[in-house]
UniProtKB/Swiss-Prot annotation:
Keywords recorded for this protein, A-Z: Ribonucleoprotein, Ribosomal protein, RNA-binding, rRNA-binding
Species whose genome carries this gene: Staphylococcus saprophyticus subsp. saprophyticus (strain ATCC 15305 / DSM 20229 / NCIMB 8711 / NCTC 7292 / S-41)
HAMAP family found in the cross-reference section: Ribosomal_uL10
Keyword Nucleus (UniProt): no
Official protein name in the record: Large ribosomal subunit protein uL10
Amino acid sequence: MSAIIDAKKQEVDIIAEQLKNSVSTVIVDYRGLSVAEVTELRSQLREAGVEYKVLKNTMVRRAAQQAGIDGLDEFLVGPTAVATSTEDVVAPAKVIAGFAKEHQALEIKTGVMEGNVISAEEVNTVGTLPSHDGLVSMLLSVLQAPVRNFAYAVKAVGEDKESKEESAE
């Protein structure tokens, strides 16, 4: 018996470590999805660098307590799968929210972003945000716009002077 308990404690420790190290976690109820749909979801999550596991509620509850995350107990009812990402905050929410739109059977229970529990609505909202790279490129284009406009203005002034000089000759 103690070997089984030790194995379960190790599994809880692994889950707790995942929860601590992840910048984003989404907890879902996958009931009603076919095997093909779950496989499709797993492959989409894997492509985005997100780890997806079906876990026992008791183990997730104990791991969350160990990781210092409060407020998950009410969501850990029924079939539970956990998607975690250690790199991209938006990736799990983006993939799961998109998949949930196409497959009504997938229900988002809750999420954890940087240690804070968020609602299913907030997970959907985060899912609509662009990725980190997308946000960086948007910021860079906004920062480049004034410089680009200034360069166009300088070029236009130079062309205007050239045309005046040519017409004066």
